[in-house]
Amino acid sequence: VYGGLGADARQSIDLRGQVTELDTYQKNIASAKLRVSSAVETMDRIKNVARDVREQLTKLTGNPPPNQTVVQDIARRGYEEIVQLLGTQVEGRYIFAGSDIDNPPFPDSAQFFADVQAEVTAFAANGAAATLAATTAIATDDAYFSTALQAADPSPLRARVDRNLDLSYQVRANGPESPAPPPGELAPFREILRSLAT
């Protein structure tokens, strides 16, 4: 194949290797870009769901007080939609699962909801401060999330985008590792999940 090239054969082989390498980098960049842009779009949708629920509930306030069943139904639908969004996949990979792209990031979402509801049901007996503390403890518990997200420092996803450059990225359903939220505050996903489950 390269015999007719004579002295240029080596250069032709080298160039083919470089073209293949560049093609691989372009595919890696496109794949990472797709995952990151999908994560951003999904996070926008999560924000919009939370906002929509808040607006619906705000419209219900007034005299007479809203039917509690209607309020719970609105919040439950919002919760279920956000759980579904946290399970978003791109190219067959969960985008909010950290490094464990093959498993859903929030497999125990039903138990999370049930545990928060149990604390809310006990509100009359326990009071506001105890209920807030208990639901915050539930929301900060990583046990509801996938095994990889329970780890202290899961490996970020990496995409080789150049010969000496890897791009690291990840979005975790249980919130960012850094920066940590201020003391007494929950990571945004956790706050939304807790609020909708109450």
Where are these regions (language model features)?
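Amphipathic alpha-helical polymerization modules
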Residues: V1-P105, T198
